[in-house]
Amino acid sequence: GLGRMGYTDPTRPPYSASDTETFYFKDVRCKPFTVDQIHYMVKAMGNSAMLCKRAGADAIELHCYGGYLIDQFQTARWNTRTDEYGGSFENRMRFTMEIIAEVKKMCGDDFPIIVKFCATHDMGEGGGYHDLEEGLKMAKMYEAAGVAALHVDVGCYDAWYKAITTCYNKEGHQLFAAKAVKEAVSIPVIANGDIWKPEDA
């Protein structure tokens, strides 16, 4: 989902983890999901994965990166909830962990789940973005939840050039994050970010 990233009609605010500003309209605030709506979204994600499996998909990838909806729940900057889905690191990860559990329930433990996530937003200290230390905690939590592989990314819309390679980025500009994740977990790690050399891959 897009959450605060949706290019929305200013009279119809999008939903997000919290009452946070939308990306394109700074004076428009998102509507926070209720707990019942979160539960509905978890069920919908599991059902969508099941439909993918029935259609012949070999695996699914959860889109937990870049400042999109799931990342909004995971990130303190955009998640200021005070219930079980906000506050602590574990609470901010709850939505994601419930989605993974629901996909496994609907598709079986043998159906591979790949998670694409930001090991770091790489935005410096402060501001509520997550850093590499928190990203490694996320990676270990994903592995413990039974995820088959991790697709590591860096950045978010607030610094989109770090997430989407431009002609100004150095080759392999995200490899530092993928390398750190690879050393922290035993499951396969997928890297991206202007990789041209086999030795870098």
Regions found by a protein language model. Give the residues of each.
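Flavin-dependent oxidoreductase catalytic cores
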Residues: 1-201
